[in-house]
Regions:
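Structured-RNA-binding interfaces characteristic of tRNA pseudouridine synthases
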Residues: 1-245
């Protein structure tokens, strides 16, 4: 039987979601916990691959079990067994053909910036105190929706078949002393959101114009785009599936 698992994690202590041979990952931590509790080897497949230090307030993964599971009890056992920076919200059966990664229709990320130094946001938001033209940054963000090839924002030498992504929404909002960028797409490239945010910050600083921003996208050249903002401000916040509406 196949099961979906819904979880969240603080990514500070992990070298991303995906298994790393010489470093701690969220996937490996979950595999070990499930394998111990179910007394069999479990290999979970995540809906995405967050990078080192990136957080997730919603992540889905799937795994297979030869026997029917008592899911409510398993959720409690996992939360007791796992470290405090990983929380399990739900485990539920799905069809054997369901796939947490390939069936996802939309993914949403948020990037958090705090403009006032706050020790309680350390490691959870990027502290950046320079004044930013948020209205202009939102104009630039809208331009993303006019394009599909985002090679300029992708990590160099990444192993992908295509740089095409369909962006559904991209917007900045102010909340007290915080700026939050929300972006939704059918898929994302490695380092894509962080390099988009860094380039939009350059727009907000008036270092580049709206035309410059659009020309960067058209260039397909990572060197022309802005810096990658720190990972600790990035959150995977929502994953959508047609059959989980």
């Amino acid at each position: 039987m196949r099961y979906f698992i819904q979880l969240a994690y603080n990514g500070t202590a992990y070298h991303g979601w995906q298994y790393q041979p010489n470093a701690s990952s969220v996937q490996e931590t979950l595999n070990k916990a499930l394998s111990v509790l179910l007394n069999t080897t479990i290999n979970i497949m995540g809906a995405g691959r967050t990078d080192t230090g990136v957080h997730a307030s919603q992540m889905y993964a799937h795994f297979d079990s030869e026997k029917k599971l008592e899911t409510t009890s398993l959720v409690h056992k996992l939360n007791s067994y796992l470290p405090k920076d990983i929380a399990i919200f739900d485990i539920f059966p799905v069809s054997n053909e369901a796939h947490s990664r390939f069936d996802a229709t939309k993914r949403t990320y948020e990037y958090h910036i705090n403009t006032l130094k706050n020790p309680f946001l350390e490691g959870l938001s990027w502290y950046y105190h320079q004044d930013l033209d948020v209205a202009l940054m939102n104009e630039a963000a809208k331009l993303l929706l006019n394009h599909t090839d985002f090679q300029c924002f992708s990590k160099v030498n990444t192993d992908v078949n295509t740089f095409d992504c369909t962006i559904f929404d991209a917007v900045w909002r102010k909340e007290n002393n915080r700026l939050i960028f929300t972006i939704s797409a059918n898929r994302f490239l490695r380092n894509m959101v962080r390099s988009i945010v860094g380039t939009l910050v350059n727009v907000g600083l008036h270092k580049i114009t709206l035309d410059d921003f659009e020309n960067i996208i058209k260039s397909k050249n990572r060197e022309k785009a802005g810096f990658s903002v720190p990972a600790h401000g990035l959150y995977l916040t929502e994953i959508n599936y047609e059959y989980l509406k």
